């Protein structure tokens, strides 16, 4: 499923840096404190640090796979839309949902506008956080993954991409949140 026939911007440095397949080899174990980061929240125009949420509220990190502002991973596009539609369900549970993409700021702004995103979309064009969370990569972009962290930043649930199970369902993520 192509989300667009516009391939402009696809062959950039990020594409070549992430071209060779590296499987998800996440060594983060349940109960570990996850790596912190500071990224730009394109949706709300502010800087977000993961440690800002520690002791305040749990966090769901949804690493997603977007090639350009017009080309989405066919497995991730429906997941992005479902997460956006369910954003209030996470907020109702006093949980922050942060989506992380490898697109640059310009591309990310277009994604926010075109998809009408309500949830924070954090831009990580260097892919440093994808690497820190060991999500893997293939064919020009990092692979998707989801992580549920409790209030102190400990990993309570993780889902890594596989061809049999691309992304954790909304129901699975909400159940993981409800178990916190």
Task: Describe the residue ranges of each PLM region.
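Chalcogenol-based redox active-site neighborhoods
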Residues: 1-180
């Amino acid at each position: 499923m192509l989300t667009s026939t516009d391939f402009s911007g696809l062959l950039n440095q990020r594409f070549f840096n992430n071209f060779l397949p590296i499987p998800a080899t996440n060594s983060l174990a349940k109960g570990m404190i996850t790596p912190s980061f500071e990224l730009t929240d394109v949706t709300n125009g502010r800087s977000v640090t993961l440690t800002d949420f520690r002791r305040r509220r749990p966090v769901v990190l949804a690493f997603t796979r977007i090639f350009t502002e017009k080309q989405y991973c066919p497995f991730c596009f429906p997941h992005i839309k479902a997460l956006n539609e369910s954003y209030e369900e996470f907020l109702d549970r006093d949980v922050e949902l942060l989506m992380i993409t490898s697109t640059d700021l310009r591309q990310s702004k277009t994604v926010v506008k075109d998809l009408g995103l309500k949830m924070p979309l954090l831009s990580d064009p260097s892919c440093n956080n994808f690497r820190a969370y060991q999500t893997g990569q293939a064919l020009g972009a990092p692979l998707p993954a989801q992580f549920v962290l409790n209030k102190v930043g400990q990993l309570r649930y993780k889902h890594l991409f596989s061809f049999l199970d691309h992304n954790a369902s909304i129901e699975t993520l909400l159940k993981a949140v409800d178990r916190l």
